[in-house]
A protein has these predicted regions:
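Juxtamembrane intracellular "pre-TM" segments in multi-pass secondary transporters
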Residues: 2-10, 185-220
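Hydrophobic core of transmembrane alpha-helices in multi-pass small-molecule transporters
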Residues: 20, 89-90, 99-117, 219, ...
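Helix-loop boundary and gating motifs at the non-cytosolic
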Residues: 5-58, 210-249
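Symmetry-related core transmembrane helices of the 12-TM Major Facilitator Superfamily/SLC fold
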Residues: 166-183
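Helix-to-loop junctions at the C-terminal end of transmembrane segments
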Residues: 60-74, 157-158, 259-273
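Structural signature of the two symmetry-related core transmembrane helices
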Residues: 77-91, 275-290
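Loop-to-transmembrane helix entry/capping segments in MFS-fold secondary transporters
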Residues: 44-45, 129-141, 243-244, 327-340
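Cytoplasmic helix-loop-helix junction between adjacent transmembrane helices
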Residues: 107-141
Length: 358
């Protein structure tokens, strides 16, 4: 990770490793997990319900976990606990579970895995401090991890004929690496466990109109991405795309996202984060129209995926900038919890469930 370790003053390699392995897991989960559930004989509605648990648990676990961590004398232990629970619960997918069993295990895994990232974002920001414009240079390793797994797992499942049933076995070692990375990371300084004044300041900021508008925009964005993350691979399969080709299309989007993260510090020196956010929202509407109208036109599907640079990469980088602005210092952990919880959680589950009924 030479690009990451080249930045002095904070543990770039350690921070980057967590993003790499965390999003590598999502590189398998996001495009292929619905196909895995389908291979176990589940129908569209059942898959929709199970996949919606990823978003449903986001409603509760991020804010709960960040609050518990913030009030703990050793908050880093909550990161370790969450990662350990994610590994342990995911291992249960190796068992021959019925639908109820899948529901319970999926709930436990999604709860734990969603819980840890907002806390780690706060850890990252504690190291970056005034250099938050360099966040993209750390976060980009998550996109690289995602793309490595999307491409390699698609090849292993399709070309090497391991079959989609091998997916949990392939994912488990990557999850173990997430736990390993969590164990070598820590806060830049020990957070203050006395939170009364901070909690009051957070609630006051949360009521500000521009902060409310930001969270509404984030909510609507996640509603639109819910169907994409849940059913895009199945949608591609129905239109004749092989598993390997699906992996390529997912990879194209993340490659575009990587470019934006690498350029993010330059972008935010030129344009305000709020303006970047609005442009990202506009690009999302164009993307979904192209995906709906031209599923059999491969070049246009590639072009639609390239807009991921804007409607995810630019959106997310701008959101992190705004969260630092809206919730500075020790308020950032709470802000990250709300961002991952309410807009992403409620918006995502609404999008996934609505898509399952269409």
């Amino acid at each position: 990770m030479n690009a990451a370790t080249g930045m002095s003053g904070y543990p770039a390699a350690r921070l980057s490793s967590f993003y790499f392995f965390y999003y590598a897991v999502l590189g398998a989960f996001t495009p292929y997990w619905s196909l895995y559930l389908e291979s176990r004989g589940l129908g569209v509605t059942a898959i929709s319900v199970l996949m919606s648990l990823w978003y449903a648990t986001r409603i509760v676990s991020p804010s709960l976990w960040t609050t518990l961590a913030a009030r703990s004398p050793q908050p880093i232990r909550w990161l370790h606990l969450g990662c350990a629970l994610a590994v342990g619960s995911f291992a249960l997918f190796l068992l021959p579970l019925n639908y109820v069993g899948l529901f319970v295990v999926m709930t436990a895994f999604c709860f734990a895995y969603n819980a840890v990232m907002p806390q780690f974002e706060s850890i990252t920001m504690s190291h970056l401090a005034a250099r938050s414009d360099r966040y993209g240079l750390i976060r980009v390793w998550g996109s690289i991890g995602f793309i490595v797994v999307v491409a390699s797992f698609g090849w292993l499942i399709d070309a090497r004929r391991l079959g989609i049933g091998a997916l949990p076995w392939l994912m488990l070692p990557v999850l173990a690496a997430v736990l390993g990375s969590a164990l070598i990371n820590r806060y830049a300084h020990d957070p203050d466990a006395s939170r009364t004044a901070a909690d009051e300041g957070f609630r006051a900021r949360l009521r500000q109109p521009h902060v409310i508008a930001f969270f509404v925009a984030a909510f609507l964005t996640q509603v639109s991405f819910g169907p994409f993350y849940t059913f895009f691979s199945i949608y591609l399969s129905e239109h004749g795309y092989s598993t390997a080709t699906q992996g390529v299309l997912w990879t194209v989007g993340v490659l575009a996202e990587i470019a934006v993260f690498f350029l993010s510090s330059r972008i935010f020196r030129r344009w305000d984060a709020a303006r970047v956010l609005m442009f990202a929202l506009l690009s999302a509407s164009v993307r979904w129209l192209m995906t709906a109208l031209f599923p059999d036109n491969t070049p246009l599907m590639v072009l639609a995926q390239l807009t991921h640079a804007l409607n995810f990469g630019a959106f997310f980088a701008a959101a992190m900038q705004l969260l630092v602005r809206f919730f500075p210092g020790r308020l950032n952990g709470h802000g990250q919890g709300v961002f991952y919880g309410l807009p992403s959680g409620v918006g995502g589950v609404c999008g996934a469930l609505l898509a399952g009924q269409l």
